[in-house]
Amino acid sequence: MLMIRQRTTARPEWDAELELSLEARSKSRLRCFTTAGEDVGLFLERGQPPLADGDFLLADDGRLVRVRARPERLLHVACANAFELTRAAYHLGNRHVALQIGDGWLRLLDDYVLEDMLRQLGARVETVEAPFQPEHGAYGGGHHHSHGGEAEFSYAPKLHQFGVRK
């Protein structure tokens, strides 16, 4: 099994490729296969953004592995004007939908409920097969640089209690 534990910088050549869906690219622990069929174990640092199309990984044996975004069934959304597109993005954001933003269009994973909502908002929606590269959250994935429970990032669990019990 090819073991991969770290990301690395892009290079002009590589030894193997992984073609992964967004869900697979979002995992830090994953068993998968190269495009040539070799068994791979991913053990990446937790709390990092998903792997993106064109990212590079360094295997334990020194091989370079390039990541490709696997084409997925997506909804491609366009609108008559910027206001309508912004309104569609607003409603999708309220539902915490992963969203790829292009020049005059939005893409999201295929979902018939969201497709119906978008059509009701007046959007033009078509189904496409394409790699999915959604925006990352503006506030990151909660990653920090403390180690071993350092006080700066060591927060005690908190139970939220709504109302008073007697």
Swiss-Prot record:
Pfam families for the chain: UreE_C, UreE_N
Keywords: Chaperone, Cytoplasm, Nickel
Family: Belongs to the UreE family.
InterPro entries linked to this entry: UreE, UreE_C_dom, UreE_N, UreE_N_sf
Gene Ontology MF annotations: nickel cation binding; unfolded protein binding
Gene Ontology cellular component terms for the protein in this record: cytoplasm
Source organism: Azotobacter vinelandii (strain DJ / ATCC BAA-1303)
Subcellular location: Cytoplasm
Chief location of this protein within or outside the cell: cytoplasm
BP-aspect Gene Ontology terms: protein folding; protein-containing complex assembly; urea metabolic process
Protein name, UniProt field: Urease accessory protein UreE
Keyword Electron transport carried by entry: no
Chain's role: Involved in urease metallocenter assembly. Binds nickel. Probably functions as a nickel donor during metallocenter assembly.
